[in-house]
Amino acid sequence: MHQDFQEDEHEYPDIRRNPLHEVTMTSYILGILLGIFVGLFPQIRFKNFNLFIIALSLFHFLEYYITAKYNPLKVHSESFLLNNGKSYMAAHSFAILECLVESFLFPDLKIFSYSLATKLCTVLGCLLVILGQYTRTIAMHTAGHSFSHIVKTKKESDHVLVKTGVYSWSRHPSYLGFFWWAIGTQLLLLNPLSLVIFIFVLWKFFSDRIRVEEKYLIEFFSAEYIEYKNKVGVGIPFI
Protein backbone atom coordinates (compact mmCIF):
# COMPACT_ATOMS: atom_id res chain seq x y z
CA MET A 1 0.00 0.00 0.00
CA HIS A 2 2.85 2.38 0.87
CA GLN A 3 4.46 1.58 -2.47
CA ASP A 4 1.21 2.34 -4.30
CA PHE A 5 1.04 5.70 -2.56
CA GLN A 6 4.61 6.50 -3.57
CA GLU A 7 3.85 5.64 -7.18
CA ASP A 8 0.75 7.87 -7.22
CA GLU A 9 1.89 10.68 -4.96
CA HIS A 10 2.50 12.97 -7.95
CA GLU A 11 -1.29 12.99 -8.42
CA TYR A 12 -1.99 14.37 -4.95
CA PRO A 13 -2.23 18.11 -4.19
CA ASP A 14 0.53 19.79 -2.22
CA ILE A 15 -0.78 20.03 1.35
CA ARG A 16 1.38 23.12 1.91
CA ARG A 17 -0.73 25.00 -0.64
CA ASN A 18 -3.97 23.59 0.79
CA PRO A 19 -4.18 24.41 4.51
CA LEU A 20 -6.92 22.04 5.64
CA HIS A 21 -8.41 24.54 8.09
CA GLU A 22 -8.85 27.10 5.29
CA VAL A 23 -10.34 24.62 2.82
CA THR A 24 -12.65 23.15 5.47
CA MET A 25 -13.85 26.52 6.75
CA THR A 26 -14.42 27.91 3.25
CA SER A 27 -16.44 24.85 2.24
CA TYR A 28 -18.39 25.04 5.50
CA ILE A 29 -19.27 28.72 5.01
CA LEU A 30 -20.33 28.19 1.39
CA GLY A 31 -22.47 25.24 2.46
CA ILE A 32 -24.08 27.23 5.28
CA LEU A 33 -24.77 30.14 2.92
CA LEU A 34 -26.37 27.83 0.38
CA GLY A 35 -28.42 26.07 3.06
CA ILE A 36 -29.72 29.31 4.56
CA PHE A 37 -30.97 30.66 1.25
CA VAL A 38 -32.48 27.34 0.23
CA GLY A 39 -34.30 27.28 3.57
CA LEU A 40 -35.49 30.88 3.22
CA PHE A 41 -36.74 30.34 -0.32
CA PRO A 42 -40.44 29.88 0.60
CA GLN A 43 -40.40 32.85 3.00
CA ILE A 44 -38.78 35.64 0.97
CA ARG A 45 -40.89 37.60 -1.49
CA PHE A 46 -38.07 38.29 -3.97
CA LYS A 47 -37.02 34.70 -4.52
CA ASN A 48 -34.63 35.63 -7.33
CA PHE A 49 -32.14 36.89 -4.76
CA ASN A 50 -32.14 33.46 -3.12
CA LEU A 51 -31.44 31.85 -6.48
CA PHE A 52 -28.54 34.26 -7.03
CA ILE A 53 -26.89 33.43 -3.69
CA ILE A 54 -27.42 29.70 -4.31
CA ALA A 55 -25.81 30.01 -7.77
CA LEU A 56 -22.92 32.07 -6.36
CA SER A 57 -22.25 29.55 -3.58
CA LEU A 58 -22.29 26.63 -6.00
CA PHE A 59 -20.00 28.43 -8.44
CA HIS A 60 -17.26 29.02 -5.89
CA PHE A 61 -17.57 25.54 -4.42
CA LEU A 62 -17.33 23.91 -7.86
CA GLU A 63 -14.25 25.96 -8.78
CA TYR A 64 -12.33 24.24 -6.00
CA TYR A 65 -14.01 20.84 -6.24
CA ILE A 66 -13.50 20.37 -9.99
CA THR A 67 -9.90 21.58 -9.77
CA ALA A 68 -9.20 19.21 -6.86
CA LYS A 69 -10.78 16.24 -8.64
CA TYR A 70 -9.48 16.66 -12.18
CA ASN A 71 -6.43 18.90 -11.79
CA PRO A 72 -5.10 18.09 -8.29
CA LEU A 73 -1.54 19.26 -8.89
CA LYS A 74 -2.75 22.83 -9.45
CA VAL A 75 -5.36 23.04 -6.69
CA HIS A 76 -4.73 25.35 -3.75
CA SER A 77 -6.78 27.15 -1.14
CA GLU A 78 -7.33 30.10 -3.51
CA SER A 79 -8.97 27.84 -6.11
CA PHE A 80 -12.37 28.76 -4.66
CA LEU A 81 -11.77 32.10 -6.46
CA LEU A 82 -13.26 34.01 -3.55
CA ASN A 83 -10.23 36.31 -3.66
CA ASN A 84 -10.67 36.96 -7.35
CA GLY A 85 -9.47 40.54 -7.34
CA LYS A 86 -10.92 43.89 -6.30
CA SER A 87 -12.86 44.30 -9.54
CA TYR A 88 -14.67 40.99 -9.02
CA MET A 89 -15.62 41.89 -5.46
CA ALA A 90 -16.69 45.39 -6.50
CA ALA A 91 -18.88 44.05 -9.31
CA HIS A 92 -20.79 41.64 -7.07
CA SER A 93 -21.04 44.23 -4.28
CA PHE A 94 -22.51 46.77 -6.69
CA ALA A 95 -24.94 44.19 -8.09
CA ILE A 96 -26.18 43.22 -4.61
CA LEU A 97 -26.44 46.89 -3.60
CA GLU A 98 -28.44 47.71 -6.73
CA CYS A 99 -30.74 44.77 -6.08
CA LEU A 100 -31.38 45.78 -2.45
CA VAL A 101 -31.91 49.48 -3.24
CA GLU A 102 -34.30 48.75 -6.10
CA SER A 103 -36.14 46.19 -3.97
CA PHE A 104 -36.68 48.89 -1.34
CA LEU A 105 -37.66 51.68 -3.75
CA PHE A 106 -39.61 49.63 -6.29
CA PRO A 107 -40.52 46.34 -4.57
CA ASP A 108 -43.09 45.26 -7.14
CA LEU A 109 -40.61 45.57 -10.02
CA LYS A 110 -38.49 42.81 -8.46
CA ILE A 111 -41.28 40.25 -8.33
CA PHE A 112 -41.41 37.39 -10.85
CA SER A 113 -45.15 37.80 -11.46
CA TYR A 114 -45.04 41.60 -11.91
CA SER A 115 -44.95 41.55 -15.71
CA LEU A 116 -44.11 39.47 -18.74
CA ALA A 117 -40.70 41.18 -18.84
CA THR A 118 -39.79 40.11 -15.29
CA LYS A 119 -40.91 36.57 -16.04
CA LEU A 120 -38.86 36.40 -19.25
CA CYS A 121 -35.76 37.91 -17.57
CA THR A 122 -36.01 35.46 -14.68
CA VAL A 123 -36.42 32.40 -16.89
CA LEU A 124 -33.66 33.52 -19.27
CA GLY A 125 -31.41 34.32 -16.31
CA CYS A 126 -31.93 30.86 -14.82
CA LEU A 127 -31.16 29.20 -18.15
CA LEU A 128 -27.98 31.23 -18.66
CA VAL A 129 -26.78 30.53 -15.11
CA ILE A 130 -27.36 26.79 -15.50
CA LEU A 131 -25.88 26.53 -19.00
CA GLY A 132 -22.98 28.83 -18.11
CA GLN A 133 -22.10 26.82 -15.01
CA TYR A 134 -22.40 23.55 -16.90
CA THR A 135 -20.17 24.80 -19.73
CA ARG A 136 -17.46 26.06 -17.37
CA THR A 137 -17.52 22.94 -15.22
CA ILE A 138 -17.34 20.61 -18.21
CA ALA A 139 -14.53 22.72 -19.70
CA MET A 140 -12.46 22.38 -16.52
CA HIS A 141 -13.15 18.64 -16.42
CA THR A 142 -12.29 18.13 -20.10
CA ALA A 143 -9.07 20.15 -19.95
CA GLY A 144 -7.90 18.34 -16.82
CA HIS A 145 -4.23 19.05 -16.11
CA SER A 146 -4.12 21.58 -18.95
CA PHE A 147 -6.59 23.91 -17.22
CA SER A 148 -5.33 26.84 -15.18
CA HIS A 149 -7.00 29.76 -13.42
CA ILE A 150 -4.13 32.00 -14.47
CA VAL A 151 -2.61 32.69 -17.89
CA LYS A 152 0.46 30.53 -18.37
CA THR A 153 3.50 32.25 -19.85
CA LYS A 154 5.58 29.04 -19.94
CA LYS A 155 4.52 25.67 -21.32
CA GLU A 156 4.38 22.99 -18.65
CA SER A 157 5.21 19.34 -19.27
CA ASP A 158 1.58 18.19 -18.89
CA HIS A 159 0.10 21.01 -20.99
CA VAL A 160 -1.58 19.71 -24.13
CA LEU A 161 -3.85 21.41 -26.64
CA VAL A 162 -7.35 20.13 -25.89
CA LYS A 163 -9.63 20.13 -28.93
CA THR A 164 -12.27 17.58 -27.95
CA GLY A 165 -15.63 17.84 -26.17
CA VAL A 166 -16.69 21.43 -25.50
CA TYR A 167 -13.35 22.57 -26.93
CA SER A 168 -14.49 21.36 -30.34
CA TRP A 169 -17.04 24.19 -30.55
CA SER A 170 -15.43 26.85 -28.32
CA ARG A 171 -11.71 27.35 -27.89
CA HIS A 172 -12.26 29.07 -24.52
CA PRO A 173 -15.34 27.35 -23.06
CA SER A 174 -14.50 28.21 -19.45
CA TYR A 175 -14.55 31.92 -20.33
CA LEU A 176 -17.67 31.43 -22.41
CA GLY A 177 -19.40 29.70 -19.52
CA PHE A 178 -18.49 32.39 -16.99
CA PHE A 179 -19.48 35.20 -19.37
CA TRP A 180 -23.02 33.90 -19.81
CA TRP A 181 -23.26 32.76 -16.17
CA ALA A 182 -22.46 36.25 -14.91
CA ILE A 183 -24.91 37.89 -17.31
CA GLY A 184 -27.52 35.36 -16.22
CA THR A 185 -27.09 36.37 -12.58
CA GLN A 186 -27.94 39.98 -13.39
CA LEU A 187 -30.99 38.98 -15.41
CA LEU A 188 -31.99 36.83 -12.46
CA LEU A 189 -31.62 39.79 -10.09
CA LEU A 190 -33.54 42.02 -12.53
CA ASN A 191 -30.66 44.51 -12.32
CA PRO A 192 -30.73 46.83 -15.37
CA LEU A 193 -27.65 48.88 -14.41
CA SER A 194 -25.49 45.93 -13.41
CA LEU A 195 -26.55 44.00 -16.50
CA VAL A 196 -25.17 46.71 -18.80
CA ILE A 197 -22.01 47.12 -16.70
CA PHE A 198 -21.39 43.37 -16.51
CA ILE A 199 -21.75 42.94 -20.28
CA PHE A 200 -19.32 45.76 -21.04
CA VAL A 201 -16.73 44.94 -18.35
CA LEU A 202 -16.76 41.17 -18.97
CA TRP A 203 -16.51 41.58 -22.73
CA LYS A 204 -13.53 43.93 -22.36
CA PHE A 205 -11.86 41.67 -19.77
CA PHE A 206 -12.17 38.48 -21.81
CA SER A 207 -11.27 40.21 -25.07
CA ASP A 208 -8.00 41.43 -23.53
CA ARG A 209 -7.30 38.19 -21.66
CA ILE A 210 -7.89 35.96 -24.69
CA ARG A 211 -5.64 38.13 -26.83
CA VAL A 212 -2.79 37.82 -24.31
CA GLU A 213 -3.39 34.12 -23.63
CA GLU A 214 -3.50 33.20 -27.31
CA LYS A 215 -0.17 34.89 -27.89
CA TYR A 216 1.37 32.34 -25.54
CA LEU A 217 -0.70 29.46 -26.90
CA ILE A 218 0.67 30.17 -30.37
CA GLU A 219 4.18 30.10 -28.88
CA PHE A 220 3.42 26.77 -27.18
CA PHE A 221 1.68 24.97 -30.05
CA SER A 222 2.67 26.96 -33.17
CA ALA A 223 0.78 26.04 -36.34
CA GLU A 224 -1.46 23.56 -34.53
CA TYR A 225 -3.04 26.33 -32.47
CA ILE A 226 -3.29 28.72 -35.40
CA GLU A 227 -5.20 26.08 -37.35
CA TYR A 228 -7.43 25.39 -34.34
CA LYS A 229 -8.06 29.11 -33.86
CA ASN A 230 -9.08 29.52 -37.48
CA LYS A 231 -11.57 26.65 -37.24
CA VAL A 232 -13.12 27.17 -33.79
CA GLY A 233 -14.62 30.37 -32.41
CA VAL A 234 -14.95 31.53 -28.81
CA GLY A 235 -18.70 31.91 -28.49
CA ILE A 236 -18.59 35.34 -26.85
CA PRO A 237 -20.02 37.85 -29.35
CA PHE A 238 -17.43 39.74 -31.41
CA ILE A 239 -14.41 38.01 -29.85
UniProtKB/Swiss-Prot annotation:
S-adenosyl-L-methionine binds at residues 159-162, 167, 172-175, 213. GO terms for cellular component: endoplasmic reticulum; endoplasmic reticulum membrane; nuclear inner membrane. Residues 45-47, 110 are lumenal. Optimum pH is 7. Residues 176-206 dip into the membrane without crossing it. Present with 2690 molecules/cell in log phase SD medium. This is Protein-S-isoprenylcysteine O-methyltransferase. It comes from Saccharomyces cerevisiae (strain ATCC 204508 / S288c).
